[in-house]
Regions:
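Active-site beta3 strand of CheY-like receiver
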Residues: 64-70, 75
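C-terminal output helix
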Residues: 126-135
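Two-component/phosphorelay signaling modules centered on CheY-like receiver
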Residues: 29-49
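Short amphipathic alpha-helix used as the core "switch/output" element in two-component signaling
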Residues: 59, 81-94
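The feature encodes the CheY-like receiver
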Residues: 76, 106
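Acidic catalytic/metal-coordinating carboxylates
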Residues: 53, 79-82
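Conserved acidic carboxylate
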Residues: 26
Length: 141
């Protein structure tokens, strides 16, 4: 179930000539690549970046300043909520909007995501229609 939210962690100003990079952070290779393909089809003007760990994603965020990060909450190494706190603490400009992606859509997890400032919540498996419904308003804001 997708639950878009308004404010979240904020977002970067819309860049001229496009909607900015989208970063997928997912440790499962099949899921990561499927999301990448769907996003490329849905947002052909955007660069879709992929990371298999939170640590790799933090480095990509520093270098590429994505507009949106789609984040698996249950990564190995760093939990999604800790990752979001690291991103929010980065001092080099406004943080990207972070969209939670998880198979755990329990009320407690949804509340924690809202409290952590996630821009939206996606339940796995996310289909193309749901991705577009949740991401387009964030990307076009």
């Amino acid at each position: 179930m997708a639950q878009p939210r308004g404010a979240g962690l904020g977002g970067l100003a819309r860049p001229s000539g496009g909607i900015g990079p989208i970063l997928v952070v997912e440790d499962d290779s099949d899921t990561r690549h499927a999301l990448g393909e769907m996003l490329t089809d849905l947002f052909p003007g955007s660069r879709v970046l992929m990371a298999e760990s939170g640590e790799a994603a933090l480095e990509l965020i520093r270098r590429t300043r994505p507009r949106v990060v789609i984040l698996d909450l249950h990564l190995g190494g760093i939990h999604g909520f800790d990752f979001a706190a690291h991103v929010a603490a980065m001092a080099d400009g406004p943080p990207p909007a972070i969209v939670a992606l998880t198979g755990d859509a329990s009320p407690d997890t949804v509340r924690r995501a809202e409290a952590a400032g996630f821009a939206a919540f996606l339940r796995k498996p996310a289909d193309a229609d749901t991705l577009e419904t949740v991401l387009r308003p964030i990307l076009e804001a």
